[in-house]
């Protein structure tokens, strides 16, 4: 399909971030530090969950996949951004641009599905604590959040995102791009590419609206529904300590959900007529750079289970014979 594309350009030019030349080195160091923090933090989560058997539970299965998704999501855009800032070469080949767009959609969709799975896991843990305890510690196959169900949810998320990202990529590949090849963004954003196309983009726009509702809005509503049930269940708890514990358990997930869905829905599904390039860039930075970096801190590095796992792994390294 890409071979039939009638584009007359071989590459695009990414304008990058609106940064003054004298601020270039400082911003480069800042974004490099943020990217390395994202990589190391999410890798630490994945390794700890893999090595510590106490973390082989539904919530940490979803969290390890979310950390891997965040790691890859950030890696889709950040290396090219850092390279352009360092080399002052904003060009990106046409095929590479479509490839970047594909993986950007892939991992953003995957994050959306995994956030829903984690919300449902919190719902089961709080509203059905006896079932959840049996699942987590006795490994019984129950009708609620069984290990097979958890693995199926993760596998289905990976498969569905593949088809959705491929659909948008193939639709983009059929468009014609003429003289204008300047993308006012720091990555190959789908909406920015559509504005450069010199052929009819109505099919693309309808697919974005319809599939966006399925991939973003419906999962967001499912998350809100799960937390509505959670709040209703929490308010029935007579103990103030239990209420505080339940809210602290859900608060971290809700903060990431608000940051991710708020910016994505506002940027792609509810764009304003007077939306500026700077505003769109800042919003994109929030969910492509900031959210993946904050995930380890919000979810795990302040989590008692993760701290315990880190201590056990360190102790095993010091004393291999320690059980």
Swiss-Prot record:
Gene Ontology process terms (BP): sensory perception of chemical stimulus; signal transduction
UniProt keyword terms in alphabetical order: Cell membrane, Disulfide bond, G-protein coupled receptor, Glycoprotein, Membrane, Olfaction, Receptor, Sensory transduction, Transducer, Transmembrane, Transmembrane helix
Residue positions the entry lists as glycosylated: 5, 274
An MF annotation (GO) of this entry: G protein-coupled receptor activity
Subcellular localization(s) per the UniProt record: Cell membrane
Membrane disposition: Multi-pass membrane protein
S-S bridge residues: 97-198
One Pfam family cited in the UniProt record for this chain: 7tm_4
Membrane side Extracellular: residue ranges: 1-25, 80-100, 168-205, 270-281
UniProt xrefs under Gene3D superfamilies: Rhodopsin 7-helix transmembrane proteins
Record has Protein biosynthesis as a keyword: no
This protein's record includes keyword Disulfide bond: yes
Reported function: Odorant receptor.
Protein name: Olfactory receptor 1E2
Organism from which the protein derives: Homo sapiens
């Amino acid at each position: 399909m890409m071979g039939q594309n009638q584009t007359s350009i071989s590459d695009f030019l990414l304008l990058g971030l609106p940064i003054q030349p004298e601020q270039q080195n400082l911003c480069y160091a800042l974004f490099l530090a943020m990217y390395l923090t994202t990589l190391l933090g999410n890798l630490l989560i994945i390794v700890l969950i893999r090595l510590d058997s106490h973390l082989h539970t539904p919530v940490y299965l979803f969290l390890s996949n979310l950390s891997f998704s965040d790691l890859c999501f950030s890696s889709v855009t950040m290396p090219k951004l850092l390279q352009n800032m360092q080399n002052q070469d904003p060009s990106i080949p046409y095929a590479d641009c479509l490839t970047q767009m594909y993986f950007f959609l892939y991992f953003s969709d995957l994050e959306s599905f995994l956030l829903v799975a984690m919300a449902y896991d919190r719902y089961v843990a709080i509203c059905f604590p006896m079932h959840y305890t049996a699942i987590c510690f006795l490994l019984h196959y129950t009708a609620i959040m069984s290990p097979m169900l958890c693995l199926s949810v993760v596998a289905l998320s990976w498969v569905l995102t593949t088809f959705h990202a491929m659909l948008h990529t193939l639709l983009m590949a059929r468009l014609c791009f003429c003289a204008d090849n300047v993308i006012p963004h720091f990555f190959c954003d789908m909406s920015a590419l559509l504005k450069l196309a010199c052929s009819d983009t109505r099919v693309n726009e309808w697919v974005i609206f319809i599939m966006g509702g399925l991939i973003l809005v419906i999962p967001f509503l499912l998350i809100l529904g799960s937390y509505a049930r959670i709040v209703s269940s929490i308010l029935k708890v007579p103990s103030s300590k239990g209420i505080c514990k339940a809210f602290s358990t859900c608060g971290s997930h809700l903060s990431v959900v608000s940051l991710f869905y708020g910016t994505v829905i506002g940027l792609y599904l509810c764009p304003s007529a007077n939306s500026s390039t700077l505003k769109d860039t800042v919003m994109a930075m929030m969910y492509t750079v900031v959210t993946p970096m904050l995930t380890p801190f919000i979810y795990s590095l302040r989590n008692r289970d993760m701290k315990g796992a880190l201590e056990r792994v360190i102790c095993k390294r010091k004393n291999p014979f320690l059980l």
